[in-house]
Amino acid sequence: LIRYNRLSTIPSSLANCSKLDEFNIEGNNVSQLPEGLLSSLVHLNTISLARNNFNSFPLGGPTQFTSVHSINMECNTIDKIPFSIFSLAKYLSKLNMRENALTSLPLDIGSWTALVELNLATNQLTIIPEDIKSLQNLEVLIMSNNQLKRIPPSLGQLRKLRHLDLEENKLDSLPQEIGYLRELTRLIVASNQLTQLPRSIGSLSNLTHLNVGENNLSSLPEDIGQLEKLEQLYINDNPNLDVLPYELALCTNLQIMSIENCPLRSLPQEIVAGGPSLVIQFLKVQGPFNLN
């Protein structure tokens, strides 16, 4: 095992290990690989260069990733994914570039069509390219802790998406098209600048986890009551959230609701002080739905 060994160089003789299917040098001090090393390991399935000192992709071009299914380069200082670097990576289903220094994504991102999981958290990305719509197999998209200001409507075309994490960005709105993500089970948009949620959020019929805490919401759409599978709702730390829709009581599977640091002035304060379960009970009793 080469992992966590304080190595700063990798011997080029490793190219002779032609049957190697996993190349894992996680947790060392490596900043570059011998040129073409990965290309010579033609049976590679998994590559992890995580937690090293790489500031660019290994030298060797697209042939390095021809047979690879999973690439993990998290926790380096890579500032660029080279154009066409994955042009031969027709099996690449998992790419983790978390905690790097990316400021943009390559123009050919739409060609990464085998991707199922894409983790770009904790970079300096400002834009999600429209072409992301071409990643029709994508199930997990994590772009938390970036500098995103808007979500392209084309994101709504990722019909297999199950997990979308956009926490800690600079979003002030979500597109109506987000309602097309019918397979979505987890939507995390906490710590943004959202002032409202689109009504189409009620179309996310498989959603179990919704986190919209730490935003600037003043209300929630009545359509939230259509989320029959919702189990966890985080609306904490929205300093302008005065009112909750009676429809929230229709979310009968709700188990966890976080409402800390929301004024909820339209509700009796003794109800709010009693916590989430009392709030839901109040909405049931006072609302027009006769849920008792």
Label each residue range with its predicted role:
Residues 1-56, 61:
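A generic tandem-repeat structural signature
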Residues 15-20, 39-44, 63-68, 87-92, ...:
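Leucine-rich repeat
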Residues 5, 28, 49-52, 73-76, ...:
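Consensus "Asn ladder" position of solenoid repeat domains
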Residues 168, 180, 186, 191, ...:
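Structured C-terminal portions of repeat-based eukaryotic scaffold domains
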Residues 10-12, 33-36, 57-60, 81-84, ...:
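The feature encodes a structural signal of leucine-rich repeats
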Residues 1-2, 23-25, 44-49, 68-73, ...:
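Conserved hydrophobic beta-strand positions in leucine-rich repeat
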Residues 236-291:
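Leucine-rich solenoid repeat scaffolds
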